[in-house]
Amino acid sequence: MPSFVFTSESVTEGHPDKICDQVSDAILDALLDQDPNSRVACETVVNTGLCLITGEVTSKAKVDFINLVREVIKEIGYFGAKAGGFDSNSCSVLVALDQQSPDIAQGVDEADDHSGNPFDQVGAGDQGIMFGFACDETPELMPLPISLAHRLSRRLAKVRHDGTLKYLLPDGKTQVSVLYENNKPTAIDTILISTQHTAEVEGITSEKGIREQISKDLWELVVKPATEDLPIKPIQEKTRFLVNPTGKFVVGGPQGDAGLTGRKIIVDTYGGYARHGGGAFSGKDPTKVDRSAAYAARFVAKSLVAAGLASRVEVQLSYAIGVANPVSILVEAFGSGKMSNEALTELVTENFDLRPGAIIEQFGLRSLPNQRQGRFYRDVAAYGHFGRPDLNLPWEDVQDKAKELIESQK
């Protein structure tokens, strides 16, 4: 097969869209922490000096939304003299939340196809299609380009938070291009980092000097540490390294661009390496299959790869609003499977319970915020929902399921 280059991007927690995802999920955490049966569909908008939260919420919880929003924005790094025009202390916070539609609630509360089984009584919160993916390119069974991009974004945020690079500001993006030969990653072709910074960097004020200093620092303190344990590493003489290609990046965050919840769905998943059903995750409670079924689809795909039944798997699920059982299940192994796609699909149908109620129960999706000191989804909202070695995510824990699948084939 001819060689090709595949590219994926990530963004830091200070990117305007990611601020919104984290705010929406912090609100979800706070509501589920007090009332695990909360129904939440929370959208956030940020712009210069403004944060608006809107959507639908039905919950017994009592939450100080305004203070919570300010706390999230402050933790990201938008406060004080280095706030870059967006300050947690002074921005306006508007709350416009309504109750969930009773027409939607009745279908979720009592599924159209229920049979007395409690899992049959929870219908899907909406129609839709969801995809899950896994491959053997990394230890966490994720595509290498998005895995690398997230590593760089996390490291970029770390050296900002710990003061290693004091001139860095919260907004930033990374992009990684990987060379593939015979469908296997063989080299890192290009790394791009765009990072917000102060107007003066280490006493340097010229645009050229600032970019040179940032490039030097990022290679040594971000790129090298983020990739040191990988078999495929960037090589300074061969890997193209681009930093702030426009020259400078002083105005950023909500001061530079408006942000919205759900605009980084490819960053949240597989970096474009697999298909996406179109539904965002953040701000949605587990009855929304956009979120819970996408987590389940990842669990299925990762289990199949971990069991050695294929080296690359994509799983599609579809649902109808108010109906518990999936409308369809499809497994595609791209020729890498030890059995046909039809046989893999049958195996999944027989071994995985993909009703929303069962997914919620298996992963503990309603109780996780309470079990983890009031915050869970907020931590997942930045740097990807899958393949997270830094977080203990239930849909990533496939060891036992992989063993079950292996045993089922004996």
Curated annotation (Swiss-Prot):
Binding sites annotated in the UniProt record for ATP: 15, 171-173, 248-249, 257, 263-264, 280, 284
Subunit: Homotetramer; dimer of dimers.
Positions of L-methionine binding: 56, 100, 257, 288
Family: Belongs to the AdoMet synthase family.
GO-annotated biological processes: one-carbon metabolic process; S-adenosylmethionine biosynthetic process
Keyword Metal-binding attached: yes
Function of the molecule: Catalyzes the formation of S-adenosylmethionine (AdoMet) from methionine and ATP. The overall synthetic reaction is composed of two sequential steps, AdoMet formation and the subsequent tripolyphosphate hydrolysis which occurs prior to release of AdoMet from the enzyme.
Gene name as annotated: metK
Catalytic function, reaction form: L-methionine + ATP + H2O = S-adenosyl-L-methionine + phosphate + diphosphate
Chain residues that bind Mg(2+): 17
Lineage: Bacteria, Bacillati, Cyanobacteriota, Cyanophyceae, Synechococcales
Keywords assigned by UniProt, alphabetized: ATP-binding, Cytoplasm, Magnesium, Metal-binding, Nucleotide-binding, One-carbon metabolism, Potassium, Transferase
Name of the protein: S-adenosylmethionine synthase
